[in-house]
C-alpha cells in the first residue's frame, strides 16, 4: 500500500508539472503572438553611441529629449534638439543625415530652426509635406511644416479640448501623431502623468477621444513615475506604441535618482493598450525609443541623452 501511495504521489507531481509547463508555454505563445520578436527583441550595437552633442561650446553642446529618425530612399534623416547645457537654455532644431544609420553628418547650417523653442519633436511625412509636432517653451506643443525637411514654417501652438470642448491648459507635450484613413490622431502627455489621445481635422485644434489617459503610469516600477509616447507603429494589423517611462515620480528633481526606460504597448484600436510583460525592452538608462525599418529589419534607436542603436536579435 505504501509503495502504491508513493507511486500515486509521483504520478500526481508529474501531471502537475506537466500542466504548469503547458500553461507557461501557452502564456509564452500568447505573448509572442501579441508582441512579435521584431517589435520587442533588440541588442545594442557594439560601438554606441552613434550620435551625440558636440561637447564643446556650441548651440548643440548637448542633445536632449526625443529626436526623430526617418529613412527615405536609402538615407537616414535625423532631427534633434540641441542646447548649450543649462536646463533653462533655449532648445533649437538640428538636422543630420546618414547612409547607414551609424555614421552621421550634421547639416552645415544648423540649427535649421531657431525662431522658437523646439524640442522633443515628432516628424511624419504625409504626401509631399513633412509635419513636425514639437514641444515649445513650458511644454506647449506647436506645429511646423516643411517641403524638404530642412526649411520649416511655424504654424502655431496646438489647442487641445476636452470631450466637452473645454480648452485644456498647458502643459501638453511629447506629441506623437498618427494618420490613418484620413484622420489625424495625437498622443500627448501632461507632466508625464499619463498619455492622452485626441483627434483633429485641421492639425491645430484637437479634441480628446476620452478625458482619461489611454495609458497610465505603473503599476510596474519601470514606468511608475512617468510615461510619454515616442512613436506608433502598425505591424500585422496591430498598433505598437513605443514610449519612455521613469521609475521615480520625482524625476524632475535634480537631486533624485530616476531611471528612464524604453517600453512597448500593443493595441487593436489606439485606445485600449496592453503593456509588454517584459518591459523595458533595453537595459540601462536609455529612453525615447524610435523604431526604423532599414529595408530588411527593424532597428531601434534611443535618443536621450545620446543616440544609441539597437539591432534585431
Regions found by a protein language model. Give the residues of each.
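Hydrophobic transmembrane signal anchors and adjacent membrane-proximal interface regions, especially
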Residues: 2-3, 235
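Sec-dependent signal peptide recognition
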Residues: 3-10
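Hydrophobic h-region of N-terminal signal peptides that target proteins for export
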Residues: 12-18
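Carbohydrate-active catalytic/glycan-binding domains of CAZyme proteins
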Residues: 19-313
Amino acid at each position: 500500500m505504501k509503495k502504491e501511495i508513493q507511486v500515486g504521489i509521483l504520478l500526481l507531481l508529474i501531471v502537475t508539472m506537466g500542466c504548469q509547463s503547458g500553461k507557461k508555454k501557452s502564456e509564452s505563445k500568447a505573448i509572442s503572438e501579441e508582441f512579435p520578436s521584431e517589435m520587442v527583441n533588440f541588442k545594442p550595437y557594439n560601438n554606441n553611441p552613434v550620435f551625440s552633442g558636440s561637447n564643446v561650446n556650441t548651440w548643440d553642446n548637448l542633445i536632449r529629449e526625443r529626436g526623430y529618425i526617418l529613412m527615405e530612399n536609402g538615407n537616414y534623416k535625423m532631427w534633434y534638439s540641441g542646447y548649450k547645457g543649462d536646463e533653462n537654455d533655449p532648445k533649437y532644431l538640428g538636422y543630420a543625415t546618414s547612409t547607414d544609420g551609424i555614421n552621421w553628418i550634421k547639416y552645415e547650417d544648423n540649427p535649421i530652426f531657431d525662431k522658437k523653442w523646439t524640442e522633443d519633436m515628432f516628424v511624419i511625412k504625409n504626401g509631399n509635406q513633412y509635419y513636425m509636432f514639437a514641444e515649445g517653451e513650458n511644454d506647449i506643443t506647436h506645429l511646423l511644416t516643411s517641403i524638404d525637411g530642412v526649411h520649416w514654417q511655424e504654424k502655431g501652438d496646438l489647442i487641445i479640448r476636452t470631450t466637452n470642448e473645454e480648452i485644456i491648459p498647458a502643459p501638453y507635450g511629447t506629441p506623437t501623431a498618427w494618420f490613418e484613413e484620413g484622420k489625424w490622431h495625437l498622443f500627448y502627455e501632461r507632466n508625464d502623468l499619463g498619455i492622452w489621445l485626441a483627434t483633429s481635422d485641421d492639425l491645430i485644434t484637437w479634441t480628446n477621444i476620452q478625458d482619461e489617459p489611454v495609458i497610465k503610469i505603473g503599476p510596474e516600477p519601470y514606468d511608475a513615475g512617468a510615461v510619454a509616447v515616442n512613436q506608433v507603429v502598425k505591424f500585422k494589423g496591430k498598433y505598437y506604441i513605443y514610449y519612455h517611462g521613469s521609475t521615480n515620480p520625482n524625476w524632475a528633481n535634480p537631486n533624485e535618482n530616476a531611471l528612464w526606460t524604453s517600453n512597448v504597448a500593443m493595441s487593436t484600436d489606439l485606445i485600449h493598450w496592453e503593456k509588454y510583460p517584459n518591459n523595458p525592452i533595453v537595459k540601462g538608462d536609455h529612453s525615447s525609443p524610435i523604431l526604423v525599418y532599414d529595408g530588411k529589419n527593424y532597428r531601434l534607436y534611443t535618443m536621450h541623452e545620446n543616440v544609441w542603436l539597437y539591432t534585431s536579435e
